[in-house]
């Protein structure tokens, strides 16, 4: 356990609550102390939800610590069952309930005797799983529970739909542009003449989960949530799955070709090559843009990419393959799936960083001095401090990345959105020169390119004036090299002589 200024992935119970509150008519009860119940406020604000978030906190207080939790938790489950009539109540453990070593499964068994709906314990280890792993496990658990139940009752319809059909797995509340991606994926499937059988968990009913085996295949657009479910459906019902994220022109085409490969042996006779060519050459603007003079201005510019596995890997490939941008570092905070990430990005970037320490990422950005960053909300803060533009491409995100307008990242419309984001994230050539000549609207002194600590060295007036004369795009590098030279020689104040000596020492 560590004290963190910033967490990229939240604790396990947040992942479980995201899944439970994505379903329709499912209620979650969280056994937690006051303070752990911020999920309701966060979801209502960020998703701009009109309905109340279906989560109740069963508060661990001094009475509970004195008398035990069973009575209170069971009463809360039965009361919510009576008041809300949900199809399912999910009891969510937290780190507190783990510390108290309470037998929550026993509480669930006890509550099932009095509740009309189903009651399920989210079986996630709070100290081993983070938000994303817990979301994946909880989704799998709910689907397995209902498919097992339907099998016992003989209600599963395993007969496939007449036309090719798909289950889209992993669209959740509080996901990065998930609601927009959902619409775009439905549109893409319609263009491919594929019916959408079920979308889970977002806005899905647990009563419809027994229909999942009717689909011809499963599509998992995000690696973080849904893969465990897809593997279970493959092993249990022989349902193939496609886990290629359709983000960017190349990967969208690869995803569509994989879908063709999966459905043709099942009786379809489709050839999507003409569709891919039409979309790539005429419908999507991204392929045309990547050959335009505007995009050629970006060729060779340096960028850093950081985020979850899905978005960071896809963005790295788009920048390197489709836009000719030099990715100096690609990173992810999904340490549990590091091998897959390395395999995906290693040929498209200079350096791979697997870390959930925001300080390490900030220092790497300061060291590399890219022209733009593509990351999470935290990298946006880092970019503001270093005066480097940042495009947000992955969660965690703030409210400006839950846009009211239509902004998918997947599919062919997603390629247009990404092209806009990339182009608008870089400071363009003429803008650079004008800022250099006129100083922009800002009269800041030298920007310190460091995150962990501010400079401990004193620059005298002449050296500072000389530093200001150096063009902005190399100023940070000159400043850093000079300070390194001074520290190595225990020089306390940087003068013009020190600057020139430092310049000679690096052979500039």
Swiss-Prot record:
The active site is at residue 294. PANTHER family: LIGHT-INDEPENDENT PROTOCHLOROPHYLLIDE REDUCTASE SUBUNIT B. Belongs to the ChlB/BchB/BchZ family. HAMAP family: ChlB_BchB. Transmembrane segments: none annotated. Its cofactor is [4Fe-4S] cluster. Keywords: 4Fe-4S, ATP-binding, Chlorophyll biosynthesis, Iron, Iron-sulfur, Metal-binding, Nucleotide-binding, Oxidoreductase, Photosynthesis. This is Light-independent protochlorophyllide reductase subunit B. Its EC number is 1.3.7.7. Substrate binds at residues 429-430. Protochlorophyllide reductase is composed of three subunits; ChlL, ChlN and ChlB. Forms a heterotetramer of two ChlB and two ChlN subunits. The gene is chlB. Signal peptide: none annotated. It catalyses: chlorophyllide a + oxidized 2[4Fe-4S]-[ferredoxin] + 2 ADP + 2 phosphate = protochlorophyllide a + reduced 2[4Fe-4S]-[ferredoxin] + 2 ATP + 2 H2O. [4Fe-4S] cluster binds at residue 36. Binds 1 [4Fe-4S] cluster per heterodimer. The cluster is bound at the heterodimer interface by residues from both subunits. It holds the Pfam family PCP_red. Component of the dark-operative protochlorophyllide reductase (DPOR) that uses Mg-ATP and reduced ferredoxin to reduce ring D of protochlorophyllide (Pchlide) to form chlorophyllide a (Chlide). This reaction is light-independent. The NB-protein (ChlN-ChlB) is the catalytic component of the complex. GO terms for biological process: light-independent chlorophyll biosynthetic process; photosynthesis, dark reaction. It is an enzyme of class 1 (oxidoreductase). It comes from the Bacteria. Pathway: Porphyrin-containing compound metabolism; chlorophyll biosynthesis (light-independent). GO terms for molecular function: 4 iron, 4 sulfur cluster binding; ATP binding; metal ion binding; oxidoreductase activity, acting on iron-sulfur proteins as donors; oxidoreductase activity, acting on the CH-CH group of donors, iron-sulfur protein as acceptor. SUPFAM superfamilies: Helical backbone' metal receptor (SSF53807).
